[in-house]
């Protein structure tokens, strides 16, 4: 699961890096946007590529030792891991029930990536425009490809906050801590981006 998680995160970073609109931003803005959205991009990739988010027994077994040490530091409360995995699985099921197609996943990733309210951005107006373009593309795609589902665009937008139901620190702890150890996720992302 850890190797798959690393691949999915790498794919998300590579996807963003290959977007011409993303590449046109300053390096600093690119890094800030990746730092702000990596967990959601990872989850969207995991959902799109059918990674079993709730690999219950396997995940709980393999994370048991890690979570016990995390519990001692107060990060996870007893039962919190199971609850977070349940939330992630519910999110996966919700996306699967809507049967999000590849074009919709791409638009949703762009909407998540181009978050103009992220602190420290040099050009938040341009980033907001890019997010608006992604929303327009998603709306047009939904309207043309799913004409009988008039509420589809709204439903897809309303599903995006589900990706933040479990915060990025917990996503990092659940899926990446064993492989990255104490290395800050920001450094991991920067290294992935540069390679």
What do these predicted ranges mean?
Residues 1-195:
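Nuclear receptor C-terminal ligand-binding domain
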């Amino acid at each position: 699961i850890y190797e798959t998680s690393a691949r999915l995160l790498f794919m998300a970073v590579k996807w963003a890096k290959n977007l011409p609109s993303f590449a046109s931003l300053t390096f600093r803005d690119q890094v800030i946007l990746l730092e702000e959205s990596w967990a959601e991009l990872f989850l969207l990739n995991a959902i799109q590529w059918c990674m079993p988010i709730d690999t219950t027994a396997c995940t709980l077994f393999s994370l048991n030792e890690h979570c016990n040490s995390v519990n001692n530091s107060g990060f996870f409360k007893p039962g919190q891991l199971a609850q977070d995995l349940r939330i992630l699985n519910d999110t996966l099921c919700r996306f699967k029930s809507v049967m999000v197609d590849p074009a919709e996943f791409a638009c949703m990733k762009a909407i998540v990536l181009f978050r103009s309210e992220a602190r420290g951005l040099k050009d938040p107006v341009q980033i907001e425009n890019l997010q608006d373009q992604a929303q327009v593309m998603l709306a047009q795609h939904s309207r043309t490809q799913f004409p009988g589902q008039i509420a589809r665009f709204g439903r897809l937008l309303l599903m995006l906050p589900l990706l933040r139901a479990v915060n990025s620190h917990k996503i990092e702890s659940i899926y990446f801590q064993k492989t990255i150890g104490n290395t800050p996720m920001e450094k991991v992302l920067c290294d992935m981006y540069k390679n």
